[in-house]
């Protein structure tokens, strides 16, 4: 469902931010609502799954992952705003929020026995790579000319969508 959210977000971005052309407000609104609905459903399902899954081995406390995410967000907010003078937008919260949710989910899948330690580490590395790539795009966005900025806005969504499809495929394969 999070991959569907990324897909809806891609459509919205493509329509709403297409250079030199303004989409009808109703179309942009419908796509943004679809993105929000898919995102809320995905987060709800993932959180429910994380809480309802029985562990057969010990993982990292979800509280530690959440605390790390909060600290990471605050540090990145300060660095991006005060050091790089980049306007803080919702995307920073979404990047870090996705990473925290993804890491908690990988941890739950490890603790449940569905993912091995190796697969779990691979998904943690994939999550880190997507976050680094997304943060790079986030930081350079306002310094790009309009067409490059338009493409730059797509990249984090594509990376998240692919990562979520890979994780869904791994879960189905392991089941």
Name each region found by the language model:
Residues 4-12, 36-44, 65-76, 95-112:
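Hydrophobic alpha-helical transmembrane segments
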Residues 46-53, 81-85, 105-112:
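Transmembrane helix-loop junctions in multi-pass membrane proteins
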Residues 164-175:
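Juxtamembrane boundary at the C-terminal end of a transmembrane helix
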Residues 139-161:
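Interfacial loop-to-transmembrane junctions
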Residues 1-4, 25-37, 58-73, 93-97, ...:
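Alpha-helical transmembrane segments of polytopic membrane proteins
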Residues 105-140:
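Short alpha-helical packing/oligomerization segments
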